[in-house]
């Protein structure tokens, strides 16, 4: 009896060598979430499609259903997003963090959400020429957490739903918190930072960049008249809060994100 087969759009998340010539590949697929497959002979020089099975390449993959691993018998390139990423360490690390986060979200949910795959693809496309790769990653994490049901509250108090603007953020509570509900360990935050995060969360990139630029220029002007710098740059604050919210809800740090913060 012939084995069941199917075709899927897919991105390579990670790979493992198997034996002398084979490779196990973890894919993020468009409609089936994470799929683990084995590609026979792809490490040989004569492999027809082995060179395509790498991160930042979108593929149309032919899978045959297996007991534990699918068999990968064909893979056609749909899009290559490595240009502008693989030659820039910051962009490369941010893009790697996107793939790592997508895998983590897929593992955390039994049911696949079709919104995740296009979000990953769009982010990789943007990272090819992104002047602010870390901010692009933060945007992805905010939007991906929305898909997962972990979106931080950024205007209303996460505890009592009182409207903002608010001046504190607490991941465990769910995001922004008012003065009445503020827990002892909540982080102080400029309301403009929360506003910029809200814009990024809702895919309003241009407005967010305008706000971030204006806020940082204003902070720089204020700090230049004082002997001590008091304000954290807006983009830095966004990154810290986004990372804290992600780590609280996933209970795991992203290895690529830790590397990115050191670059």
Stretches found by the model and what they are:
Residues 1-263:
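Non-catalytic alpha-helical scaffolds and adjoining flexible linkers that form interface surfaces
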